[in-house]
Amino acid sequence: MASQLTDAFARKFYYLRLSITDVCNFRCTYCLPDGYKPGGVTNNGFLTVDEIRRVTRAFASLGTEKVRLTGGEPSLRRDFTDIIAAVGENDAIRQIAVTTNGYRLARDAASWREAGLTGVNVSVDSLDARQFHAITGQDKFRQVMAGIDAAFDAGFEKVKVNTVLMRDVNHHQLDTFLAWIQPRPIQLRFIELMETGEGSDLFRKHHISGQVLRDELIKRGWIHQLRQRSDGPAQVFCHPDYAGEIGLIMPYEKDFCATCNRLRVSSVGKLHLCLFGDGGVSLRDLLQDDAQQYALEERISDALREKKQTHFLHQSNTGITQNLSYIGG
């Protein structure tokens, strides 16, 4: 096995976010308000199952323990179950998760679990069906809620729910969310609205710091939990009276990048060192044959030397990320 992926700032990388499509059938106001518009995909299309098998094998050899499949909406891939199984061929990868809008979860949760999926994140920005429709452009609230129930029925012990925190939209609904997770083992993760190239106006209108919620949680007796090395960026809080947990993802907080442990590969095979970085390193030419694995590992390791210490969101520099479906959020 090659050495553990480590950058110039001694950060170790155990977590790969792998986008498998940039297509999405929802029109969320903060991501794709005008719906999906083709244009970012080359003639080669999205990564094939074999290419996904090779890239995850290389990352596993370099110390990756967790792979999250993202999009777009990953379940729009007809071969999604095969993709899960391909990633699971790597014994070193202990966790395989998906971030989904949940519209196919009720139908497919059991088959995904059987294929090897170990974790599910579902995007739910409101518990009010009408507001959910307004945010997502889809009248699918009850279908998504049924999907979360189906995930538990399929054997997932915990479901993570992602909620983008937006001023005057849902920031005042903490009590409603807390009542929902009190009897349920759901980790509800409030994610600060992030500025993207296409979303500057929305950001200025609706951004609110997660610190407001953190202060309120601490006041109510919620306790900050220790972070594991392959965990995502959320600060997680628990409370003895609740089956669920609260996570806060606050990319504008000081030192947010100090604990970065994740890298990204786009749906067309580009390595991105940061969600809000520039450019990207193409890996695709080294995903065509198993014999290329050593060269692939070398290219990944070499690219990591260029990873910056921090993003530049505070300067409104969003890099190449025009919207969050482009690389995989």
From Swiss-Prot:
It holds the Pfam family Radical_SAM. GTP binds at R17, R68, T99, K160, R262, L263, R264. It comes from the Bacteria. One of its GO terms (biological process) is Mo-molybdopterin cofactor biosynthetic process. GO terms for molecular function: 4 iron, 4 sulfur cluster binding; cyclic pyranopterin monophosphate synthase activity; GTP 3',8'-cyclase activity; GTP binding; metal ion binding; S-adenosyl-L-methionine binding. [4Fe-4S] cluster 1 binds at C24, C28, C31. It catalyses: GTP + AH2 + S-adenosyl-L-methionine = (8S)-3',8-cyclo-7,8-dihydroguanosine 5'-triphosphate + 5'-deoxyadenosine + L-methionine + A + H(+). Its cofactor is [4Fe-4S] cluster. [4Fe-4S] cluster 2 binds at C257, C260, C274. The keyword Repeat does not apply. Binds 2 [4Fe-4S] clusters. Binds 1 [4Fe-4S] cluster coordinated with 3 cysteines and an exchangeable S-adenosyl-L-methionine and 1 [4Fe-4S] cluster coordinated with 3 cysteines and the GTP-derived substrate. Its EC number is 4.1.99.22. Residues 8-234 form the Radical SAM core domain. Signal peptide: none annotated. Gene3D superfamilies: Aldolase class I. Keywords: 4Fe-4S, GTP-binding, Iron, Iron-sulfur, Lyase, Metal-binding, Molybdenum cofactor biosynthesis, Nucleotide-binding, S-adenosyl-L-methionine. Pathway: Cofactor biosynthesis; molybdopterin biosynthesis. InterPro entries: Aldolase_TIM (IPR013785), Elp3/MiaA/NifB-like_rSAM (IPR006638), MoaA (IPR013483), MoaA_NifB_PqqE_Fe-S-bd_CS (IPR000385), MoaA_twitch (IPR010505), MoCo_biosynth_MoaA/MoaC (IPR050105), rSAM (IPR007197). S-adenosyl-L-methionine binds at Y30, G72, S123, M194. Monomer and homodimer. Catalyzes the cyclization of GTP to (8S)-3',8-cyclo-7,8-dihydroguanosine 5'-triphosphate. Belongs to the radical SAM superfamily. MoaA family. This is GTP 3',8-cyclase. It comes from Salmonella paratyphi B (strain ATCC BAA-1250 / SPB7).
